[in-house]
Amino acid sequence: MSGFQQHTGLVVPLDAANVDTDAIIPKQFLQKVNRTGFGKHLFHDWRFLDDAGEKANPEFVMNQPRYQDASILLARENFGCGSSREHAPWALADYGIRVMIAPSFADIFYGNSINNQMVPVRLTEQEVDELFTYVHDTEGATITVDLEALSVTANGKTYHFEIDDFRRHCLLNGLDNIGLTLQHEAKIAEYEAKIPSFLK
C-alpha cells in the first residue's frame, strides 16, 4: 500500500448523524471477501430508487453533479456505527473516498478505515458545522488534510486533529496488519529455521 501524507480533494457533505454500516453497504452486497467492487453499492438504498441500482436518486447528495469525484466525505457524529463489517470501509475506499471528517466515528469502523488507508478525522461539532457551511456555500469546495502536520485546511482556515502515533505511523507508511508483520520477516524466518522438523 502507498502511504498517506497529504491529500486535497473535493468534499461531499453527508448531513446525517448515526450513519450505520448497513446504510453504507447493505447486507445483500456482502457475499465477496475481496476488497474491490463494493464502491458501486455504496449507500445503495439512498443513492438508488430501485433494487437493481439502475435508477439514481437525484435528491441524494452523492448523485448531485457538483459533488461528483469527491474524495473527502464530511459527516456528522457517530459515523460508521452498527455492525463491524469491514465491507463498509471497503465500499468507501473503492468509491474513491480518501478522507472522512466527522465529530466522531464508531470505534471499530475507525480502526477498519485506517487499516484500509483511509484517514478518519475527528473535529469538534463547531468545526464540522463551519465546514458544512463552507461546502454548502461554495461549489467545488476542497479541503486539504495533512497527516504529517495533523491539520485540515479549508477556506483559508486551519483546524487541527489528533490521531495516535501508531496509527499515524501505519497511515504514513502504508502499513496494514500484513505489512506490519512483514517488517519482521527476517526474525520470523530466523525463528522458523529453529523449529524442529517434526513440528513443521
From Swiss-Prot:
A single MF term (Gene Ontology): 3-isopropylmalate dehydratase activity
> Keyword Amino-acid biosynthesis on this protein?
yes
Q: Which reaction does it catalyse?
A: (2R,3S)-3-isopropylmalate = (2S)-2-isopropylmalate
UniProtKB keywords: Amino-acid biosynthesis, Branched-chain amino acid biosynthesis, Leucine biosynthesis, Lyase
Q: How does it assemble?
A: Heterodimer of LeuC and LeuD.
Question: What NCBIfam families does the record tag this protein with?
Answer: leuD, PRK01641.1
What's the protein name?
Answer: 3-isopropylmalate dehydratase small subunit
Q: What is the lineage of its organism?
A: Bacteria, Pseudomonadati, Pseudomonadota, Gammaproteobacteria, Vibrionales
Question: Gene symbol?
Answer: leuD
